[in-house]
Regions:
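S-adenosyl-L-methionine
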Residues: 1-69, 99-486
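Polar, glycine-rich mid-to-C-terminal structural blocks
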Residues: 75-116
Length: 486
């Protein structure tokens, strides 16, 4: 990767490496994206290919100053290194350009079988498109034809925050129609667009010009066709048209919660949409096997995972030549998990983010109240912040279940997730000893620290570090195998 194709920080890493003498050292601080995406490919990976050896690293830590960023510390030795490797203050066998200690087996390839099955939602560009539900309903009451250009608008925040994953706003959508049609067929909605969207688009263009930014094709189109989304994603809506529902996940999230939604809405750019309506695919994507693959090959935004279809989904190797029994098992556990999770969130009135905060909370305990009068600080010291948050929420919310009931329900969700992971492992054939793959993998579900998360939020209910390392190794080898066959 030429230096000009990467960011400035990766360039400095490479330039300093060029300048130091043989057997010299360099040690730098960067945001944690130095080990992700193109920054990794054009920075640390190039350094290693040219004789550099990463012998020390802190993969991710909060910047000690005021800036809300996650940083990495990276030490590089120029030349062969025969001493200890230290990763996150632990001695390891090696450190890769991903700042982990996995075997060096190369990078995953995009697979043809996953092509055109995942999409980013529509990039609207303009707050004027967005309406409150009452405003949209009023416009439809005034003119029933307006329902053809007014839709519920689902974004990542609603998906992860609302207990029923329902959209909280509506949006105008004139598709790719010409201005005359919009003006004549939907005059009330067109007038709103003219008064709100057009000035916003013009202001965005003016600001770019004032900053000396050269205008591209998309900028000119955004100005000239101001009533149309910047990226309407016709290929997305055309692909999902035959389906009854689609699978979605928030693009930026620490939970990575996949769920189904109906297609009668505009899906925002902060959603990744999968042209899939089967529970067996949902089981695989929601499993810890895919979860750790996603974290390995993602980029991050602050400390959250940013799900990119090209680097995560298109490279992910699904089980090949599934037996009918395995497909049935995946369907059944996926459906059971999805239905139980939906009922649980409605019952405790929490969205994905806060529900999974409890899912990963090792101190969750129904015996938080035992008749003693104690301070919030004492409760938090004993049961943890998340447990106290749940207890307070249930106390304040009417007609919601008790802390005992909520605790038992969340523990059952963990059990279902464990069963789903085991069904996915079996679909790959890794639940038993084989000549091709070696010994069976024991997933060993429990609460573990995961090194890719911030220091103050690393506990997850997941598979063991040993299982994670072996799963990622086999998935990468399977990716290479499928790629060669294609």
């Amino acid at each position: 990767s030429p230096a000009k194709s990467v960011d400035l920080v990766a360039f400095f890493f490479r330039r300093i490496f060029q300048l130091i003498k043989e057997y010299g050292f360099q040690a730098l601080i960067a945001t944690n994206t130095i080990a992700q995406g193109k920054s990794r490919e054009g920075g640390l990976a190039i350094i290693q290919q040219n004789g550099g050896c990463i012998n020390f690293a802190i993969r991710s830590m909060r910047w000690p100053g005021l800036a809300a960023v996650e940083i990495s510390q990276v030490g590089v030795h120029k030349g062969e290194w025969n001493k200890e490797y230290v990763l996150d203050n632990k001695i390891v066998e090696r450190i890769t350009s991903y700042l982990d200690d996995s075997e060096e087996l190369g990078n995953p390839h995009k697979l043809h079988q996953n092509k055109d099955k995942s999409f980013q939602g529509s990039i609207v560009l303009g707050k004027g498109f967005v309406l409150e539900p009452r405003e949209a309903q009023k416009l439809i009451s005034q003119n029933p034809k307006n329902k053809n250009v007014l839709f519920p608008y689902l974004n990542g925040r609603d998906l992860n925050s609302n207990p029923d994953q329902s959209p909280s706003r509506w949006v105008i959508n004139f598709f790719d129609w010409d201005e005359d049609k919009c003006k004549s067929d939907f005059p009330e909605v067109y007038l709103i667009a003219l008064n709100k969207i057009k000035p916003q688009r013009n202001r965005l263009i003016t600001e770019k010009i004032e900053k000396g930014v050269s205008l591209g094709v998309h900028d000119r189109r955004a100005s000239e066709e101001w009533w149309i989304y910047l990226w309407p994603r016709p290929e997305l809506y055309r692909t999902i048209a035959p389906l009854k529902r689609v699978l979605v996940v928030a693009q930026v999230s620490k939970t990575l919660a996949f769920t189904f939604t109906t297609k009668d809405k505009v899906l925002d750019a902060k959603l990744i949409v999968f042209a899939n309506e089967s529970f067996n695919k949902m089981s695989i994507l929601q499993s810890n096997l895919h979860y750790h693959w996603a974290w390995k090959y993602c980029t991050t935004m602050k400390s959250d995972l940013c799900y990119t279809p090209r680097t995560i989904f298109e490279t992910f190797p699904f089980p090949q030549n599934l037996y009918q029994e395995s497909e049935f098992n995946l369907d059944q556990i996926g459906k059971t998990y999805d239905e139980y999770r939906r009922k649980l969130m409605l019952k405790i009135q929490l969205g994905f983010t806060k529900t999974y905060n409890q899912f990963h909370n090792p101190l969750l305990n129904s015996k938080i109240v035992n008749g003693e009068v104690v301070s919030r600080k004492e409760l938090q010291n004993k049961f943890g912040k998340e447990t106290v948050n749940l207890w307070n929420h249930l106390q304040k919310t009417e007609d919601v279940c008790s802390i005992e009931e909520a605790t038992n329900d969340i523990k059952h969700l963990r059990q279902l997730h464990k069963e789903m992971d085991e069904a996915v492992l079996e679909a790959y054939g890794w639940h038993e000893d084989t000549e091709k793959w070696g010994p069976a993998i024991d997933l060993a579900h429990d609460f573990y620290e995961v090194d890719y998360l911030p220091e103050n939020d690393r506990i997850r209910y997941t598979i063991s570090p040993e299982a994670r390392k072996e799963v990622l190794k086999r998935l990468l080898l399977l990716n290479h195998e499928i790629y060669e066959d294609e």
